[in-house]
């Protein structure tokens, strides 16, 4: 995973240059800083968020089942939250206990469908409605 300061996100391919990008309800994965930190604290580890392999990291929001169907706005980008990003065995390979630590309370993040094409930048405002 490579961190970038800006990214083009499209309805056709999700986050541009993502090799897994394609249309559908799991186009973009979004991770919450707060939920990532809670998972890391539960296993006494200080891990970089890119280990999670999520497309985007947002601060100030936590996700739950009540968010499915809501819109997440990042700058000019609108995403529809479609579900939970389930942690997989790759998380366990990245760090012992991480898969289990990401399991409760949607700590693994959410999947989203892209509703409009937009360029997003580090520091863009993030809201959910």
What are these regions (language model features)?
Residues 92-93, 124:
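Short, charged, solvent-exposed linker or helix-capping segments at domain edges/interfaces
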Residues 110-129:
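Well-ordered alpha/beta subsegment
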Residues 45-55, 94-108:
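Short, basic/aromatic beta-hairpin or loop at an interaction surface
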Residues 1-90, 119, 129:
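Electropositive, beta-rich accessory/interaction domains or terminal extensions
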Residues 78-82, 101-115:
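Active-site scaffold segments
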